[in-house]
Amino acid sequence: MDALSQLFYLHGIGYEFTKYTGEQVIFSEDTRKRALQCCGVNTEDEHQIAQLNYQLDVAPWLELAPDTSLVNLTDNLFYIRIDERQRDLPVAITLPKLNVTYERANLHNLAITGDYYVHGVRYIEVAVPLGAIPVGYHQALVSVGEQSKEVQLWATPEKVFQVDDTKRTGLSLQLYTVKNKAGLGIGDFNDLLELCDLCAQQHMDYILLNPLHLLFAQQSERASPYSPNSRALLNPLYICIGLSADAKNNPQLDALLHSDEVKALFNSNEQFINYEKVSAVKYELFKALFSHFEAHASASRRDEFAQFCKQNAQTLTTLNSANPTFDYYLQWQAKLQLSHCQQHCLNKGMAIGLINDLAVGCAGDGVEYQSQQSLFSDNANVGAPPDPWAQAGQNWGLPALNPQQLKNDHFAFYRSLIRANMQGVGGLRIDHVMALRRLWWCFENNHTQDGCYVYYPFEHLLAILKIESHLNQCIVIGEDLGIVPPEVKHALAVSGIYSNSLFYFEKQHDGEFLPLQELPKHCLIMIANHDVPPFCGWWQTDDLDIKRQYQLIDDQQYQQQLHERQQEKQRLLRFIQLHSAEQLSETSDAMCVYGELAKALAHSETRLFALQLDDLDKQTYPVNIPGTNTEYPNWRRVLTHSSNAIFKNNASTLAAVNSIRKGYE
């Protein structure tokens, strides 16, 4: 292997991949060079290449242990690397905060798990058994003879946090679309509280949310929760004014609530959220809350706020705000209300409660990127390889993290990100979970768009998910739609991470829907989500009409897709008829078909089954059309009915699904 090829391998630059057609595609050396250049490597500098190869391949064998050393709690083995001539020396591994030291007189009679020759000297890796260690990150001092090194010892459980292995039902929704009881034009945490009550009454165990990440207050129309300003901070627009302690006895706030601007918003009843108006009004109300806090807050509340700022200083300071205390206050209020909703779920008997959603990346001009720029690649974005729906591939416009820089940072950024998204909830869905293993990088190469897979330190990123899930008592769902490498699928299953399936895509080779008994068990299954049309729209082919209306497809494509949809509907009817005595046809009412489909899927052994609020509301307009930006008003469509009305209208279906899932029928 030549020096450049070695560096490709050590830096995680992919060599080949399997295309959606089944064809094996080998990346050109030119493409791989460009990817390496995006990592800050001068591919024409032989000295730099040799130096990097030494740092990544040889140097680790000259250290007693990696800076971040994983200890799997199934065997409690700690791996030490030594010159084989040092096996007679005593070894000590000290964990100061646990007040524990593990000592051995020598390193003989231990399993050798690897070796490497440097200048003719054999270095070996030996497995040192330790005692029981609590899950978490521990500072450790490793000593062999006179040589010593401080490392982070990550005590990693075999699986992520688990709940009892039983069939559960839940609700999925985009919180901003919920009909706001306060009339302020966007769903908020009080609306979420109401949904907690409604779900608990139907014996549901969880509510799957959209990403609640911070967006752009100064550019309020940038509405995509999947292209956020920061994934570690919350969107203040979800704060319910009335839930804040600072709303009580607040004359300034009361006057604003009776203003013409608020009344206009209250009476607007628009189909699509006007983020500019909503944001302008809510931020005026936020200022009134903050003014009241500054003037009247008790000493205990001030201490609570100060403690929040201290505990979250690293994340809060990324805001780089002109009025930091105000922005920190909003983050505090949002965190309090989210945690209150989660506790309310648990108090009502829900086994999991809220499930948060973590976007795969952040915007290139956001505070997350700007504050951590050294961790990101140069001029490479995250995307997807060519597929039948995007022959040229997809560029999602999200900066790609540099895997080597993540490692050099001791993964502090990723640990902090996962922790922030697991706090105050009972579960976390990881969007595009394959990113733990590899991501498709998009970059310009000789004035044309190019791309390849780049691999990430999978074992460490997976360890963080396992550790944080236990520390936060949080289940993990990995969104694995699309091409999933076999090693990722296996590792996620072994780690107890739920997969995520869309029923629309669960097909056999002949195009028929998978039989119930073949649906994955340790999985979250949904009929639809934010990337596909709501069921009524799909059944009535409204989504195709909308695409034609917005000139996303021409008449010929419309007719072709209409024909394909008719075939799909026939396949769906055949699936339902295997599990239902109801006589249905293509002309059947969409909600009748939906109800029978929901009841059929309720019989599956799949552990998590989510009903989408959009579907229960009989929505025909999608909340998002993938591949569009300004062509369609994505991330804005509001639900037609109140949450209470939606549950009332679907009472019989919800009761039947619950009865089937609980085994009463």
Residue ranges and their predicted role:
Residues 85, 218-339, 361-610, 614-616, ...:
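Alpha-amylase-like alpha-glycosidases and glucanotransferases acting on alpha-linked glucans and related
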Residues 618-665:
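Structured C-terminal cap/extension of enzyme domains
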Residues 18, 163, 181, 363-364, ...:
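Short helix/loop capping segments that flank catalytic or ligand/cofactor-binding pockets
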Residues 14, 205-206, 351-353, 427, ...:
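Residue-level detector of anion-binding/catalytic polar loops
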Residues 1-59:
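Long, contiguous interaction/targeting segments characteristic
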